[in-house]
Amino acid sequence: NCIFTSNFANERGGAIFLNDANATFTSCTFSSNTNGSTGSGGALDANNSRLTLSACTFTGNTSGALGGAINGASAALIFADSNFTSNVSQLEGGAINGTNASLVLTNCSFTSNQNASFNGGGALNVKGGTLSDINGTYTGNSCAPGSGGGAIQWAGVDANFTETSFSENQSPSYRGGAIIATSGNLQFSKCIFSDNTSGARGGAIRGESVVLSFFESNFISNQSTLNGGAISASNSSLSTTRCIFTSNRSNGNGGG
């Protein structure tokens, strides 16, 4: 039940920096925390640590580089029933950036987060490690022009999404309105992708050198400027089982 507001660190963790630590936060609020132009973790930075969040709120935090709200490196990040709204990073991961991290999300929402100037991942950027998301919500997140993954960007990550929804996320001039993935194994079960947009390929999802598996998932009114109104993939394996594609649109090839 703690409140962290308008704190500043020039480098890592605008409010809190964890190193080789085990920390738990319950019903805490983090708002308007920030760091310097090369900093990471606008509110919280966890290095080689275990971080557990329950029923926490992150709003309007900013980072000069990585992770507008949270940055985790070689960390275990376990978040439940938490909300991330209007957080901004200049580089990667508007809300969360993870590098070689294990990220487990349950009942978390990401709304109107943004990476503002370079790279990608309006809500999440994950490089290496694993990602699990159950009953998550990603709405209205965006990445900077020329970067990819309006909601999520990842590379070399094995990821599982269950009953997670992605809506109105956008990549204005690049790939993956909701998600861009380069390498890794991605599984989606009972997920919904609606009204996501890409200025290039993959209105909802762009996969490059990945394994994509979809089960009982719906794609509705997603749009791309070039190829793949819903999904675009290259050098990848793609399987869909009992999925529904409705009113997706591409101005180039492959409306669905």
Specify the residue positions occupied by each region the protein language model found.
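Extracellular beta-strand/beta-solenoid scaffold signature
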Residues: F8-F17, G36-A46, T62-N71, V88-N97, ...
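Right-handed parallel beta-helix
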Residues: N1-F8, N22-T34, R50-T62, A76-V88, ...
